């Protein structure tokens, strides 16, 4: 499904929170949306592998990487796993790498920057916790919509028909 965050903001301005414009699209899907699962991890993506092995249909993984752009939390291998398990998208408050490969994949990936250095894989972090970045607090179960214009968040799903 295609989402237009500008239109959604016009229709639902009282019901959505707008994430500060810190992110760029690195995935092959221009827009995406779904119910979110939150993760908090710093320069370590081991926990992401565990979560992205789950069925992701209708879901978006929101990763609070502390805003670090020293190590990439998502690479092509991890993004392919997300595509294989039908995740709608990834929002990374941190960095990604292998961007040429990422843009070929049918998944939305919003992140702050790209860097060639990979993350550690020790599974240090927490999932299903409240995370805050971009002026917005994210809770697992909230609904996120993203496109090349921005990212918005709603407690409840928006009627997009």
Swiss-Prot record:
Q: Which UniProt keywords apply?
A: Cytoplasm
Q: Which Gene3D superfamilies match?
A: Ribonuclease E inhibitor RraA/RraA-like (3.50.30.40)
Q: Which GO terms describe its molecular function?
A: endoribonuclease inhibitor activity; enzyme binding
Give a Pfam family name.
Answer: RraA-like
Task: Please give the chief subcellular localization of this protein.
Answer: cytoplasm
List where in the cell it is found. Cytoplasm
Listed under GO cellular component are: cytosol
Q: Which GO terms fall under biological process for this protein?
A: negative regulation of RNA catabolic process
By sequence similarity, the record places it as follows:
Belongs to the RraA family.
Any idea what job this protein has? Globally modulates RNA abundance by binding to RNase E (Rne) and regulating its endonucleolytic activity. Can modulate Rne action in a substrate-dependent manner by altering the composition of the degradosome. Modulates RNA-binding and helicase activities of the degradosome.
- Alphabetized NCBIfam families for the sequence: NOT-MenG, PRK09372.1, RraA_entero
Q: How does it assemble?
A: Homotrimer. Binds to both RNA-binding sites in the C-terminal region of Rne and to RhlB.
Protein's name according to its UniProt entry: Regulator of ribonuclease activity A
Q: Which organism is it from?
A: Shigella flexneri serotype 5b (strain 8401)
